[in-house]
C-alpha cells in the first residue's frame, strides 16, 4: 500500500510535527495525502463531522495534520483514541464514537477489536488517497508491547509500510537511540526501516555530518535530513508532555494563568490567547502561580471530580475565590466550568467512583454526568458577536435563575463558564472577551491565519532540510531490498 510510517526513538521525538510537515510537503506536490494514527493516547481531541452530520472525535494532532494535508478530517484518520481518566484506566473512542473503558489489566483482551478496527481504517484511507502518512506512538522498540502492537511495526507489517525513525537530538544520545531502536527489532521489522530524520538540531551542521555518515555506515540506512530547532514551530499538541514549554513568547502587560490540572484536556483552548501581544500566558499548579494573574482559566479535564478534589487539596480553590473577590475575571471551560458550579453529580460512575461533589459555588449551575457523550459543533452568539466551538462532554448542565447564558454555559459578573472548546480561536469572540474582561482593544490577530503560517513554515523547513523527493518515492515504492540486519534483534 502507498504510505509511510513515521516512528520515533521516544515519545515527543517529533513524530506529530514531522507527519504534519510531510503532509504539507506532499500536498504541495499535488499528492492526495492523508494522515493516520492507529491509536492515540491523549486528552486533547477535536470534533469533526461524521456520517450524516453527526459529530465524531479524533486526536487534535490528526486534525491539524489533516489541515496540513488539505484533507477533510475524519474518524478513519485516528480510529482508536484513548483518553486517560486515571493512571490505570482509559476511555476508548472507536472510529470517533464512545466505545467504553479499558483498564491496563485487561488491555490485551480488548486489543484485538481495536487492532482490527485500526487496520480497516488504514486500508480504507489507502484506497481513497495517493499516500497515507502514518504516525507511530512512543517507540517501535518497546519489546514488551510488540506482540500486541498495531500502531508501530505491527501496522507497518500489516500494510508493508516503509518506516523512518525520527530522533530528538536536543535531548542528547540520538545516535545510540537510532542504532538501539533498530537493533531491538526483529529481522522482519528491520527490513521495513528505511532510515532516519534528525530533529531539533541547533548549531553547525558540518559538525554533525561525520556522525550522520557513520550512522549510515553502521546501519546501512539513509539519513533523510536534519530538521533545525525552531522556536515558533509549535502546533496543536496531542499530550501534556510539552506543557512546560507552552508559554507565550510575549511579555505582555496582562498575565493569564491557566490551572494545570492533573487530567487536563484540550489545553489548546488557550493557544489563541498565547498569540495576543498584550498577554503573557503561563500554566500554574499552586496558589502562588495564580496570585498576580489578571485572568485565570480553569481548563477542561477528563476527571472533573477528581481534579476538583486535587484543586482543593492544593489550596487553589481559595486562590480562585480571592481572585473573584478582587473583581478579576475567571473563565472555566467544560470540566473547569463544571467545577465553578454548585454541585457535580456522577450517579453512574462515568468519570470515577465519587457519585457527587460540591462545586465552588461561583456559578448558579448544576452538572449531572450521563452515559452518552455529547459531540457537537455549536454556533451562536456570545458577547454580541458570532461564536463557534466544539463540545466533548458527558455533563448535562442545569442553570439556575442567577445564571446568565454564555456559550452553552453561564456567566455571573466576571465569572464565565462555557461548554464550548475552541471558542477563543474565533477572532471576534476572543476580541470581545478580552475587551469585556481586561479592557483590551483588538490586536487584529487571526488565529486561523497564524496556524496556517506555522503549517507553511513547517512545510518550508521540511522542503529545505529533508530529501522530500526520496521520501515520496519511498512512500510510493517501498524500501530497498536486502537492508542489513543489525544484531541482536528482538529478544
UniProtKB/Swiss-Prot annotation:
A GO molecular-function annotation: catalytic activity
Alphabetically ordered keywords of this record: Cobalamin biosynthesis, Glutamine amidotransferase
Domain GATase cobBQ-type intervals: 253-429
Active-site positions on this chain: 334 (nucleophile), 421
Function recorded in the entry: Catalyzes amidations at positions B, D, E, and G on adenosylcobyrinic A,C-diamide. NH(2) groups are provided by glutamine, and one molecule of ATP is hydrogenolyzed for each amidation.
Protein family: Belongs to the CobB/CobQ family. CobQ subfamily.
Name of the encoding gene: cobQ
Pathway per the UniProt entry: Cofactor biosynthesis; adenosylcobalamin biosynthesis
HAMAP family: CobQ
Transmembrane segment boundaries: none
Listed GO biological process terms: cobalamin biosynthetic process
Keyword Hydrolase appears in the UniProt entry: no
Matches recorded under InterPro entries: Class_I_gatase-like, CobQ/CobB/MinD/ParA_Nub-bd_dom, CobQ_GATase1, CobQ_N, CobQ_synth, GATase_3, P-loop_NTPase
UniProt-listed Pfam families: CbiA, GATase_3
Name of the protein in question: Cobyric acid synthase
Gene3D superfamilies recorded: 3.40.50.880, P-loop containing nucleotide triphosphate hydrolases
NCBIfam families reported in the protein's UniProt record: cobQ, PRK00784.1
